[in-house]
Amino acid sequence: MIKIYNRKTKAYDVEQVAGLKYINWSYASPIGKSFLELFIKKKMFSKLYGNFCDSSLSKKKIKAFIDEFNIDMSLCNKNIDEFENFNDFFARTLTPEARPIDYSENILISPGDGRLSAFENIDLDKVVQIKGYTYSLKELIDDPKVAEEFEGGTCLILRLCPTDYHRFHFVDSGTCSESKKISGFYYSVNPIALNNVSELFCKNKREWSIFNSDNFGEILHVEVGATCVGTILQTYSPEKRVKKGEEKGYFKFGGSTTILFFKKDTIKIDSDIVEQTKLGFETKVNMGETIGHK
């Protein structure tokens, strides 16, 4: 059972996990682990399932998925019958009113919907993946020189599950470098997997870029793929100015993760998020929601 902190009620909600039986089998049983290493984590598995989700046959899955996970379609720009396939639904866009944004220069917003963890004063060689598990930022982006600039800074991990809005956005106005792609596996990013696969973020397919923000300095933006996420699509134009809240890109089907790194003393994350992280809980947030300040 995965408990998530609800900022509005100040209580814990139980996450409804898509494919829970499959995840438990793959990461906690001997046979499942063998199948995971031989097939599930490989590109071919995610590519095959991705092709299915791109086909018209997958359209039949949409209504059942919406009903099972109680997804509010009133926030979406399309009606159910307008989606061409499951990936079209999965990467759905929302109405502007669905995700209000605070445009104040000193306010930091969430880059997307998901479950947020915040780690301050980070050690580059021991960045927290999940409580009790760490990884190296240098290994994550394969660029020691860039990584060193974020020593002692702040790390935000935004975990998305399959039921979430899967587009990610810029947290401030500014310009962003071209994304660098790093090949890797396709492990799930569910906490069950994070507790069973060491340095998972460094093993999965990922992309990173440097966002030169107007108000929070240089931000290292990392997108991590996961099981069935065969594609991370960047929709922004490198080095072209963007406004706060503009779309940066999106993930195709599957759970996935966005990680942001801030340099030391450039940001202060809201205390409730930091405290919940210390207690071992993620905090549910939506894109555009205030999560910190200068």
Swiss-Prot record:
Single Gene Ontology MF annotation: phosphatidylserine decarboxylase activity
Bilayer topology: Peripheral membrane protein
GO cellular component annotations of the record: plasma membrane
Active site: residue positions: D113 (charge relay system), H169 (charge relay system), S256 (charge relay system), S256 (schiff-base intermediate with substrate)
Keywords: Cell membrane, Decarboxylase, Lipid biosynthesis, Lipid metabolism, Lyase, Membrane, Phospholipid biosynthesis, Phospholipid metabolism, Pyruvate, Zymogen
EC number: 4.1.1.65
Any one GO BP annotation for this protein: phosphatidylethanolamine biosynthetic process
Family: Belongs to the phosphatidylserine decarboxylase family. PSD-B subfamily. Prokaryotic type II sub-subfamily.
Assembly notes: Heterodimer of a large membrane-associated beta subunit and a small pyruvoyl-containing alpha subunit.
Function according to Swiss-Prot or TrEMBL: Catalyzes the formation of phosphatidylethanolamine (PtdEtn) from phosphatidylserine (PtdSer).
Annotated protein name in UniProt: Phosphatidylserine decarboxylase proenzyme
Species of origin: Clostridium perfringens (strain 13 / Type A)
Lineage: Bacteria, Bacillati, Bacillota, Clostridia, Eubacteriales
